[in-house]
């Protein structure tokens, strides 16, 4: 296969940069200058047939000569207004790469609330000993009843972790195999009886607002809401009201409607709320592993083999 022209605008560190330069064909790579949105970068992008990174959606209209774009993310809602992938273009994402770190962060946030770590860290700042006050309030994950919305890579990994802790888990998905909950009625009943409601859903036309005011208010007073999916899935105003009025037991939020949150946002001051600030998928070798994923797919592309993790714009995953 002829040498491909490759445009790279993904966020890289030095090890990832070196790996790309040592692996890809010499003379085939153009690294974007930052900021990415510039006439120079657009001109380079328009001459490439492979892109690694998330370019503005407007760059795909009119359709470029691009044949394959490897996103540096799982989510791709910013491309869904395209309605369809330009003819001849395949888009892949990083499905599965963030499953373990995102699930670990969710568990860490839950344990912080259940084991009183949030209160103890706050007390440490003022040198206050709270052992006798905190200890009787500590809870275990063991035997907790959990509902997971979404049965993709993050949802499945989170389920595995919950089951390892001895939780009783049910998953909600309309089509994915292995999920026990399929209907809206089944989901409503499960949310109303759960100790933990964990959302791992992408943003699609079907999921936006799925966790609405009625469902949030139906949660038990001790229940904790977890979101590692997308902020748009949740009625955030209703969630904040329930947290402020102590109608639910707390929240662990990796994602929010607005990112970054402005300093005056009410979530900052909600009690028993852990804000992970969209760090859930992060880990030390994240950028290197993103690059390895791209290079593995590049090898398939060069051989004419099917690529991993081809997205469906219409479905949103």
List PLM regions with ranges.
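Adenosine-phosphate binding glycine-rich loop
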Residues: 109, 261, 270-292
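NAD(P)-binding Rossmann-fold cofactor-contacting core
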Residues: 164-180
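NAD(P)-dependent dehydrogenase/reductase Rossmann-like domain
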Residues: 287-317
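Short beta->alpha connector loops at strand-helix junctions that form conserved
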Residues: 72, 90-97, 173, 278
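Rossmann-like adenosine-cofactor binding region
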Residues: 175-266
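Glycine-rich adenosine-cofactor-binding loop
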Residues: 95, 139-163
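Phosphate-binding beta-alpha-beta segment of Rossmann-like dinucleotide-binding domains, i.e.
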Residues: 87-145
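An N-terminal-biased, well-structured beta-alpha scaffold segment characteristic
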Residues: 1-92, 192, 212
């Amino acid at each position: 296969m002829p040498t491909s022209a490759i445009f790279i605008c993904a966020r890289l560190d030095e090890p990832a940069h070196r790996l790309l330069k040592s692996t890809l064909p010499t003379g085939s790579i153009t690294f974007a200058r930052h900021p990415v949105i510039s006439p120079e970068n657009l001109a380079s992008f328009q001459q490439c047939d492979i892109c690694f990174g998330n370019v503005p959606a407007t760059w795909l209209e009119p359709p470029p000569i691009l044949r394959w774009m490897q996103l540096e993310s799982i989510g791709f809602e910013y491309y869904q207004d395209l309605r369809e992938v330009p003819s001849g273009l395949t888009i892949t994402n990083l499905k599965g790469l963030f499953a373990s770190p995102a699930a670990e962060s969710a568990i860490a946030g839950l344990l912080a609330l259940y084991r009183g770590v949030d209160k103890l860290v706050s007390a440490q700042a003022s040198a206050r000993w709270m052992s006798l006050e905190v200890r009787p309030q500590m809870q275990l994950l063991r035997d907790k009843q959990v509902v997971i919305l979404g049965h993709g890579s993050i949802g499945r990994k989170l389920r595995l972790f919950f089951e390892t802790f001895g939780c009783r888990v049910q998953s909600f998905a309309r089509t994915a195999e292995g999920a026990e909950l399929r209907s809206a009625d089944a989901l409503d009943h499960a949310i109303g009886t759960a100790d933990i409601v964990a959302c791992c859903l992408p943003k699609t036309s079907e999921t936006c607002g799925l966790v609405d005011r009625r469902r949030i208010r139906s949660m038990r007073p001790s229940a904790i809401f977890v979101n590692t999916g997308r902020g748009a899935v949740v009625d955030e105003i209703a969630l904040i009201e329930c947290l402020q009025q102590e109608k639910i037991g707390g929240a662990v939020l990796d994602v929010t409607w607005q990112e970054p949150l402005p300093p005056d946002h009410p979530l900052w001051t909600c009690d028993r709320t852990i804000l992970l600030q969209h760090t859930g998928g992060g880990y030390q070798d994240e950028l290197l592993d993103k690059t390895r994923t791209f290079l593995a797919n590049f090898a398939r592309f060069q051989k004419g083999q099917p690529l991993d993790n081809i997205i469906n714009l219409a479905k949103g995953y």
